C-alpha cells in the first residue's frame, strides 16, 4: 500500500467546449479510484476555486484585487467540490472537503488535528480534497498555488509520495522558453543538489513564481523522507502512469535520514514571531553538536514575544540557521542578558528537541 498526496494545479483544470472542467476532473478521478481499489490511499490537493468562481460570474478577466479573488474563491469552491463529488461518486467513492491555511498549520494543536482527521478519512476509504482557505488567507492567491500546502499535508500524514502535477514536463536547468539549450532535469538526488538548484534559479525569472514554490515544496517533503515527482498533468493519463509506478518528469529523491514530523513542522509550518541572535560559540554548538541554546550564548533579541512561541535563530553573520520554540519571553531574555554576571548557571532558552536547523 502506498499513501499518495497529489497536487493538481489551477491551469490543469481549465476545460473548453469539447473537454470541460468536469471531463478533466472525471478523468483524474478514474485513475485515483483505480489506485484506491488496488489498496493505495490518496489525498488530493486541488486548486481551481478562483478560476471556477470567475467562470461562474462570467468575468472576462481574472480580478486583480485580493478581496475579489477571495470572493471568487468562495463561489468557485462550492462548484469545485460538486464536480469532485459527482466524479468520485460515479466510481463508488466518497469525498471530504478540507480547507486549511498556513497559519492554522503553524499551530501544533491544529497541525495534529488536521493530521488525525486526514488519517481517519483515509481509514474510512474517503478521498480528502484539500484546498487553501482563500477566504481567510491570501497566501495561495499571491504566491503558491497550493504547492507548499501539499508538502505540509504530505508531511502531516507521513505520506510515501507527493506528486506535483503541472503544465511542464520536467524541471529544466533554465527557462526553456528563453534558452533553447536548457536541459531537462530527471533526478534531484539529495538536498545539496536541490539547494544548488534553488540558488541557481533565484537569479533568473525561471526561479520565480510557480517553479520557486515547487522547489520549496520538494524541499519540505524530501527532508521528511517523502519522494516527490513533478510531471506534466495536462494529459490525465500521466497520473495513472505515475500511480502505477512509472518514472515520469523530475524525481526528487527522499532524504535517507529524514528529520521527522515534529522537526519538519518546526522548520516549515511555523511562522516565527521574533529573532534570537547568538555568538559564534553558541551557533557552533547548535550546528555541530546538536546542543540546546542557553542564555549565555545569546547576544540580543528582536521582536516581542511570550514564552513558548516560535523564533528564528540568527548567527553572527545575520543569517538565519535554525528555528525553535523559545522557553523564555523576549522581555525575560533581555533582563537575563543585562544581569548575566549576577546569575549562577545559564537558563535554557530553546531545548534541542524543539530546535531545528534550517540551513547547512
UniProtKB/Swiss-Prot annotation:
Chief location bin: cytoplasm
Positions that bind ATP: 7, 166-167, 208-214
Function: Catalyzes the transfer of a phosphate group to glutamate to form L-glutamate 5-phosphate.
Reactions catalysed according to its record: L-glutamate + ATP = L-glutamyl 5-phosphate + ADP
Official protein name in the record: Glutamate 5-kinase
SMART domains according to UniProt: PUA
EC number(s) recorded for this UniProt protein: 2.7.2.11
PROSITE patterns: GLUTAMATE_5_KINASE (PS00902), PUA (PS50890)
Keyword Hydrolase included in the entry's annotation: no
Pathway terms, separated by semicolons: Amino-acid biosynthesis; L-proline biosynthesis; L-glutamate 5-semialdehyde from L-glutamate: step 1/2
Lineage, highest ranks first: Bacteria, Bacillati, Cyanobacteriota, Cyanophyceae, Synechococcales
Binding site for substrate: 47, 134, 146
Biological source species: Prochlorococcus marinus (strain NATL2A)
HAMAP family in UniProt: ProB
Span of domain PUA: 273-344
Presence of keyword Nucleotide-binding: yes
Keywords, sorted A to Z: Amino-acid biosynthesis, ATP-binding, Cytoplasm, Kinase, Nucleotide-binding, Proline biosynthesis, Transferase
Cited PANTHER family: GLUTAMATE 5-KINASE
Encoding gene per record: proB
GO CC terms, sorted: cytosol
Family classification: Belongs to the glutamate 5-kinase family.
Highest taxon listed in the record's lineage: Bacteria
One Gene Ontology term of the molecular function aspect: ATP binding
Subcellular localization: Cytoplasm
GO process annotations (BP): L-proline biosynthetic process
Amino acid at each position: 500500500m502506498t499513501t499518495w498526496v497529489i497536487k493538481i494545479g489551477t491551469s490543469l483544470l481549465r476545460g473548453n467546449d469539447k473537454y470541460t472542467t468536469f471531463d478533466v476532473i472525471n478523468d483524474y478521478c478514474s485513475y485515483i479510484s483505480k489506485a484506491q481499489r488496488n489498496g493505495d490511499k490518496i489525498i488530493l490537493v486541488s486548486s481551481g476555486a478562483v478560476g471556477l468562481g470567475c467562470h461562474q460570474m462570467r468575468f472576462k478577466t481574472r480580478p486583480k484585487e485580493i478581496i475579489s479573488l477571495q470572493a471568487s474563491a468562495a463561489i468557485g469552491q462550492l462548484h469545485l467540490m460538486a464536480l469532485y463529488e459527482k466524479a468520485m461518486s460515479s466510481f463508488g467513492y466518497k469525498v471530504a472537503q478540507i480547507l486549511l491555511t498556513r497559519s492554522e498549520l503553524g499551530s501544533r494543536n491544529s497541525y495534529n488535528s488536521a493530521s488525525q482527521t486526514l488519517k481517519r478519512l483515509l481509514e474510512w476509504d474517503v478521498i480528502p480534497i484539500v484546498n487553501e482557505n482563500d477566504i481567510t488567507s491570501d497566501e495561495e492567491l499571491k504566491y503558491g498555488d497550493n504547492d507548499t500546502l501539499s508538502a505540509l499535508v504530505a508531511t502531516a500524514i507521513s505520506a510515501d509520495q507527493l506528486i506535483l502535477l503541472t503544465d511542464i514536463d520536467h524541471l529544466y536547468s533554465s527557462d526553456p522558453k528563453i534558452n533553447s539549450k536548457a536541459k531537462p532535469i530527471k533526478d534531484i538526488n539529495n538536498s545539496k543538489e536541490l539547494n544548488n538548484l534553488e540558488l541557481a534559479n533565484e537569479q533568473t525569472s525561471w526561479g520565480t513564481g510557480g517553479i520557486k514554490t515547487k522547489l520549496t515544496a520538494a524541499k519540505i517533503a524530501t527532508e521528511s523522507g517523502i519522494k516527490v515527482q513533478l510531471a506534466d498533468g495536462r494529459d490525465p493519463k500521466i497520473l495513472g502512469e505515475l500511480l502505477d509506478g512509472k518514472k515520469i518528469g523530475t524525481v526528487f529523491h527522499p532524504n535517507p535520514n529524514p528529520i521527522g514530523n515534529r522537526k519538519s513542522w518546526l522548520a516549515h509550518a511555523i511562522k516565527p514571531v521574533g529573532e534570537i541572535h547568538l555568538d559564534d560559540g553558541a551557533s557552533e554548538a547548535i550546528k555541530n553538536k546538536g546542543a540546546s541554546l542557553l542564555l549565555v550564548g545569546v547576544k540580543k533579541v528582536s521582536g516581542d514575544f511570550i514564552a513558548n512561541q516560535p523564533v528564528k535563530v540568527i548567527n553572527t553573520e545575520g543569517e538565519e540557521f535554525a528555528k525553535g520554540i523559545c522557553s523564555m519571553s523576549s522581555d525575560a531574555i533581555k533582563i537575563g542578558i543585562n544581569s548575566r554576571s549576577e546569575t549562577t548557571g545559564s537558563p535554557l532558552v530553546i531545548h534541542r528537541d524543539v530546535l531545528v536547523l534550517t540551513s547547512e
